[in-house]
Amino acid sequence: MSRFRIPGAGRLSPARPLRFTFDGRTYSGLEGDTLASALIANGVHLVGRSFKYHRPRGFLSAGAEEPSALVGIRRDATRQTPNVRATVQELYDGLAAISQNRWPALSFDVGAVNDLAAPLFSAGFYYKTFMWPRKAWKYLYEPAIRASAGLGVAPKEADPDRYAARFAHCDVLVVGGGAAGLSAALAAAESGASVVLADEQAEFGGSLRFESGAVIDGRLGWDWAQGAAARLAAMPNVRLLTRTTAFGYYTQNILGLAERLTDHLAAPDPAAPRERLWQIRAKRVVLATGAIERHMVFPGNDRPGVMLASAGRTWLNHHGAAVGSAVGVFAANDSGWLAALDLAKAGVRVAAIVDTRPAAGEEVTQAARAAGIEVLTGHTVTRTDGRLRIGSMTVRPVSGGGSARRIAVDALLMSAGWTPSLHLFSQSRGKVAFDEATQRFLPGQYAQDCACVGACNGTESLAAAVAEGFAAGEAAGREARKGLAKSPPPLTPPHKGEGDSAAPTTPSPLWGGVRGGGIAASGGGRPPAVDASEPCSGGALGDAAGGVKGRAFVDFQNDVTSKDIRQAVREGMRSIEHVKRFTTNGMATDQGKTSNLHGLAIAAQALGKPIPQVGLTTFRPPYTPVTFGTIVGHARGPLFDPTRRTTTHAWATRHGAVFEDVGQWKRAWYFPRAGEDMHAAVARECRTVRQAAGVFDASTLGKIEVVGPDAAAFMELIYTNPWQKLEPGRCRYGLMLREDGFIYDDGVVGRLAEDRFHVTTTTGGAARVLNQMEDYLQTEFPHLKVWLTSVSEQWAVIAVQGPKSRDIIAPLVEGIDVSDAAMPHMSVREGTICGVPTRLFRMSFTGERGFEINVPADYGEAVWEAVWAEAQKHGACAYGTEAMHVLRAEKGYIIVGQETDGTVTPDDVGLAWAIGKGK
């Protein structure tokens, strides 16, 4: 048993031990541990170094918001993942983790010299330092800064793992599997709706993981959660996704989710995907994403062993591990007191509870005194001491000028309240609203079909969260199923029992602050008075009494202090986005989950403005880091860019063609005979086309059908040429320009009927021309009745060019007179060739007589074989793209993208004649 593992505490079984290593040293853990909880159980708090100053860092949280405990995970030489949050990584037997951003060792890091040079690296230092001598930047400063940048080391080997992707749709998607989320999923599922419930943890339960006294429906909260999950798993209309993070909320209720499939396994199946990307469209979304506990901002708050109260409770109540043997608690709300009571109940000595408020809740105060815990209300922590882990804290009264007192501790739990997790809500384009009474942002105006429930909605009690989740789930399910099925009977929501904790899920902290300090929460319904000119005013946190000073950290990973944020304001930053970039607050891998609101409050205080007027930084996806492999999926290596082949590719291969890449297409470049190099082969092909005939695969050209009563009017608006008077059965060269008048694309257009055009584009322009047509049709000309359909891959195109081209195709076509009188140049006819339906174009890209045979792609190779057999009778040859380029250049025909570069007008290339006189 690890020395900080408490027998009988937690929910893990000691009968399932696991072995793992951290920085080469072997430790033991239990099945169900995270790497963080296992290290805590072994008394290990130092796990990393901060980004800028290389200060010792421990754990701050027990969840995805963790900014400090980033490690590298190594399975083998090819499987190394940097910047993994130890609080999320599940333990497995043989796990090997290494600390990051240190040299030569974690306990002795040469980079810590940066901490001594901290004045050189203050906020915005990159704008103000390393400016002299000028040449030193290129040869000294920049190389040194770049060499020291970053945290983990990216793997150098190719990723050997597989990744998967799935698309899904459902009536109701519930994000978050805590009490509110489970309740919402149950209600929605029982209404008959199809439901997807996703949670980033390995098990459902959310905050019930650490709420030891919660009771729902007469059962302990955690037991109720597992029972609810089992009920949902048994329902055919429910899909449960654990270890799945909803990282992005996009338009039309599409959410991106990353499911971790094998990172928790000791020996994963090499054929199984490591992660899966889900893209889910839901009729209704219920966000039950919870809240993130706020840390206190005071000097020395970054020392290993100083952590959030919820982290200490999670590791104690779920994993059975104590964070120390003499634990201090620093709080501004009752959540910290609950952590102290849980520790005391488990037999861990609580050195003291320090609370900035004049008084805490009566129930928790009485319980603390009954447990023999020293209570110091109206006090604050002014500093901590200890080299690689906290060894003591110094406290003093908030006001009244009392003397400072030093208390020995080996861990310090802190809690300044809770911040609703609104990242996904904001990504959905929802507008947040600032609640003055509780000094926090809450969901305001909704932009999509979603609802926020529980702690992320600011709901403060477990009972209210369960009821709110149930109501939202039932409403979402009924609305999504409206008119599709018989309405189910009224549902009965879960009932919260009497054993639940009395503390609200989301307390109501209020901000305060002074010179050099940060943020404190205070009771009383309104913020304390603040006098920024005095170091000890209003119960705020700042410089310690007696002139002792220290740095109070806001962003633990990027080493941003409260002083840095005030400095940014002094140097002219007024927008919170400017403050963010000047200080790098909230720009670390955690994207400011624990630091954004603190930085905002300090900046608002420095500016003398209310928090809402300063603004809120933009929440962008992903919510937490997502591996490149998850995003890329199968699209790598040969599958990164699809290789497209025409129907004659196999034939060309058999006949010795040399291929070239044209966009995604493999095209026959030339057909060398024995002893020929490219120049000889191309010269022969060109000569044969001029003297007899040649057969060429032109299937890669883009093909778009423009159909509808307004098709001709639409063509007039898209192309420079006139189209209204073009008769069915005739073709015309079409020129398309950008809005600035430069050439965009070209091609031959055949009018098949009054309301139907067969449009060809360049090979490279097929997709972009269709997109531009669609864009204009939907935004500029929505009144036109026109339908656009890409048929590029539906038609194989065989070009027969040369003086004998008519002799080659005449015996093969049925129902089409190919004489000059019946089918003049620039004509199109429909009939059959070799019994296959065809659109036959009389056109040329060589200057010789030519025909282009369009047949359904499935028949392309068969028709080609028939044409080739006939062509050989007339001395024709197959030719490739190189000969095509020579032949068209000899006649002065342009290719968009070769004779044009985006700055060429029609007149520049002799195409002024293609512009209609009335345009």
What residue ranges belong to the model's regions?
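Residues forming the flavin
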Residues: 1-487, 502, 520-643, 794
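A short, contiguous, amphipathic alpha-helix enriched in charged residues
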Residues: 37-47, 704, 709-726, 807, ...
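Residues forming anionic-ligand binding surfaces in small-molecule and nucleic-acid pockets
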Residues: 198, 291, 683-699, 743-756, ...
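Glycine-biased, low-complexity coil/linker segments
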Residues: 493, 497-498, 511-516
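Acidic, proline/glycine-enriched N-terminal capping motif
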Residues: 598, 606-737, 742
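Conserved, structured C-terminal
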Residues: 649, 653-654, 667, 753-755, ...
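Well-ordered mid-protein domain cores that form the structural environment of catalytic cofactors
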Residues: 724-755, 760-772, 776
